[in-house]
Amino acid sequence: MTLRKLLALSCLLLPMIASAHKFETNQRVPPVGIADRGELILDNDKFSYKSWNSAQLPGKVRIVQHIAGRTSAKEKNATLIEAIKAANLPHDKYQTTTIVNTDDAIPGSGMFVRSSLESNKKLYPWSQFIVDSNGIARKAWQLDEESSAIVVLDKDGRVQ
């Protein structure tokens, strides 16, 4: 599957996945910074976190996946994520950014959500995983609770 086909498929699915949002076509996503937890970093088999900001999004074509820290939200995007994996897109031009809202997780499951993210980071070290412990991105982007949203960005970080 080519990058162009993947982006076309994503754009077709976008209205079904993200109904309420604050995204505008050809604009950057509303600014958001996540300092509590933030981006999951894997360095020499050790995990750490660093602050993350949406200003870091330009530079590559991206699919930004924002999901509640719930299995039901993750399952909504499973078909698209499998298509991305199968497409074997070049890591120097494409990146998936997954923002997980652990503030919107089933009580007591946050530890399991973070463990799952760590496993995925080991499998897909080129992907970006962001832990949003306070639901900052969901609030800034006006997303539905207990759900997911997919946003396709061009290399300049503009919504497509």
Sequence positions of predicted segments:
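Cleaved targeting-peptide boundary
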Residues: A20-R28
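A short beta-strand-turn-helix
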Residues: V32-V61
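Hydrophobic h-region of N-terminal signal peptides that target proteins for export
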Residues: C11-S19
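Structural microenvironment flanking redox-active thiols in thiol-disulfide oxidoreductases
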Residues: Q65-N120
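A short, hydrophobic beta-strand/beta-hairpin element that forms part of a small beta-sheet core
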Residues: S148-Q160
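Bacterial N-terminal signal peptides that target proteins for export
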Residues: M1-L7
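Short loop/turn microsegments at loop-to-beta-strand junctions
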Residues: P30, E146-A149
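Short, internal strand/loop/helix patches
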Residues: Q95-I99, M111-D144
